[in-house]
């Protein structure tokens, strides 16, 4: 980061940044790819921090009259966005071990979101649980908020190839210690990412500045 800032050509600040942030998306795709599960740049969506990405995801995917589902103990902004966008929601309780009760997420819904690890509890759901929730909700987008995944646990990124309704959201603010750069990103299949871009570009094409992209 320091090297990129030192080498940045200040004269470029007179120009608008790339609205698609292609170089940044290519770099993120390369960073999260593994040989068994490569990620392409067009599977990456970037925003000004993960809150920006999550808010756009709520606006894009949670537009049914059916309630969305998220745990009662969870990231505190989920209900804020739901209320802001007029999205009905239900908040199933956690079990006695403070983990998701899988059966609660296999009911009719307009979408699902949960943090993994859960921000307040620090507990991680295993991939089998996540996959079952995603697989049994083929008509709903399931968002896994992995803001803290690097502090312990396994990412659900390997499931993206298999499920077109799965969106993974991560951030540069926590384990990468770059909160001041305001970079959040989502990984999903190309079609899902294209829907996010359609909404984003409809009202704000330039969400990231040139220094951040550098």
Regions inferred by a protein language model and the residue ranges of each:
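Short glycine-rich anion-binding loops that position phosphate/pyrophosphate groups of nucleotides
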Residues: 1, 50-51, 75, 116-120, ...
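PLP-dependent aminotransferase class I/II
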Residues: 19-20, 165-214
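Short acidic capping loops at alpha-helix termini that bridge into adjacent secondary structure
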Residues: 37-44, 65-67, 146, 164-165
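PLP-dependent aminotransferase-like
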Residues: 60-115
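Active-site phosphate-binding strand-loop segment of PLP-dependent enzymes
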Residues: 95-150
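Catalytic-core regions built around general acid/base machinery
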Residues: 129-137, 158-162, 195, 199
């Amino acid at each position: 980061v320091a090297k990129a800032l030192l080498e940045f050509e200040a004269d470029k600040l007179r120009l608008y940044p790339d609205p698609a942030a292609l170089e940044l998306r290519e770099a993120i795709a390369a960073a999260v790819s593994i040989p068994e599960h490569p990620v392409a740049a067009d599977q990456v969506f970037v925003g000004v921090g993960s809150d920006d990405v999550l808010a756009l995801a709520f606006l894009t995917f949670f537009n049914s009259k059916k309630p969305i589902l998220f745990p009662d103990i969870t990231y505190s902004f989920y209900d804020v966005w739901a209320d802001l966008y007029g999205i009905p929601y239900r908040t199933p309780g956690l079990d006695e071990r403070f983990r998701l009760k899988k059966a609660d997420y296999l009911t009719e819904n307009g979408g699902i979101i949960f943090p993994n690890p859960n921000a307040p509890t620090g507990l991680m759901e295993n991939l089998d649980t996540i996959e079952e929730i995603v697989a049994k909700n083929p008509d709903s987008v399931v968002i896994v908020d992995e803001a803290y995944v690097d502090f312990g646990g396994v990412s659900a990124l390997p499931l993206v190839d298999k499920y077109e309704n799965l969106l993974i959201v991560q951030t540069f603010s926590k384990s990468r210690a770059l909160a001041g750069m305001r970079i959040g990103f989502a990984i999903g299949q190309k079609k899902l990412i294209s829907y996010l871009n359609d909404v984003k570009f409809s009202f704000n094409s330039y969400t990231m500045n040139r220094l951040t992209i550098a």
